[in-house]
Amino acid sequence: MGKFTHIMIHCTDTPEGREVSKEDLIKWHIKERGWSRLGYAGIWHLDGDFEVLTPFDEDGEIESWEITNGARGWNGWTRHFVYSGGGNNVDTRTVYQLANMRSTLIQELHYNPDVKIIGHNQVSSKYCPSFDVSQWCETIGIPKENIDYGKYY
């Protein structure tokens, strides 16, 4: 719980074309791993639709009810978003996901202009989200001051 400083991008680590539902994530995170809550605040589906998984507001703070278990050590100040796909370290984002990912991030930065965007693979030795978030953010016009280029592991 604290000031909202980061948006972290994740992948579901599933094959290209496989949709992932909220129910799938509940099964994987809560039932199988025993987590107390989901790992993500929202998911971009294959058709580009963004589904809120854990409700959040735009007040610049991560409240206890907004916390998700996306990356150990980062959850108290980070909003975690995931896209369906990314299995085997392959960027499988659809054109629809790409378009709405950009729109979602621009909207989040409108409400929280000091937030930085980062990939899960920048805070853990994983390949998730299967693409270079910093580089992609540059190509879609995210201001450099909103891109976290660091490696934290």
Where is each model-derived feature located?
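Cell wall/extracellular polymer interaction/catalysis modules
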Residues: 1-37, 43-46, 68
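Basic/polar, cationic surfaces and motifs that engage anionic cell-wall
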Residues: 1-12, 16, 46-57, 61, ...
